[in-house]
């Protein structure tokens, strides 16, 4: 993949030494993009197995508070039903960039070749998301529990000035805070 976009139509660029991939995950099958986005983040974390990585709800992976990876899932209605695409972009190798935010690079803490990361990520995505009649259904509860465990390393969410000591995720991947379902991380900070 050589082009794309981020959330809210933000500019997305592929820097040298980076990884960018897109998958048509569901076509004519019901799957929620929010849940898929979290599953994509979990697949990245599982493919690397590094404790230093943090999953920042809803779609980023961080190293020491700096963005390493972004995940975007988007659904569109098509003639056969719904088509859902998952996109993942990650900074594998240190490179010069002109980003507005601090970026992290995987090679600062771990060396992996592009092909090896790609192979591992495909395996993890397949294990989490493959749809076939002869396989058990997608394990939403198991994925939710793993994502929540990874999110705990960020601290507690602050939303509208309130810090929440208890938070959860629903089956759509929305953050549950005080009985409210939040679908956008733009106004959430972690303390």
Language model region names:
Residues 10-13, 17-18, 22-191:
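Catalytic beta-strand/loop module used to bind and position nucleotide/cofactor moieties
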Residues 1-11:
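Basic, glycine/proline-rich low-complexity segments that contact nucleic acids
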């Amino acid at each position: 993949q050589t082009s794309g976009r981020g959330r809210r139509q933000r500019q997305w660029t592929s820097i040298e030494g980076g990884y960018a991939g897109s998958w048509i995950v569901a076509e004519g099958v019901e799957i929620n993009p929010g849940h898929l986005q979290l599953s994509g983040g979990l697949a990245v974390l599982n493919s690397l197995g590094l404790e230093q990585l943090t999953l920042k709800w809803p779609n980023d992976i961080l190293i020491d508070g700096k963005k390493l990876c972004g995940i975007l899932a988007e659904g569109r209605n098509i003639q056969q039903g719904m088509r859902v695409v998952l996109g993942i972009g990650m900074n594998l190798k240190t490179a010069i960039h002109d980003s507005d935010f601090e970026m992290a690079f995987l090679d600062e803490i771990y060396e992996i070749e592009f092909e090896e990361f790609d192979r591992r990520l495909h395996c993890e995505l397949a294990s989490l998301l493959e749809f076939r009649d002869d396989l058990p259904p997608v394990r939403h509860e198991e994925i939710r529990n793993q994502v929540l465990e990874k999110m705990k390393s960020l601290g507690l969410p602050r939303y509208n000035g309130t810090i929440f000591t208890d938070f959860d995720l629903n089956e759509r991947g929305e953050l549950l805070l005080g009985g409210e379902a939040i679908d956008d991380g733009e106004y959430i900070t972690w303390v």
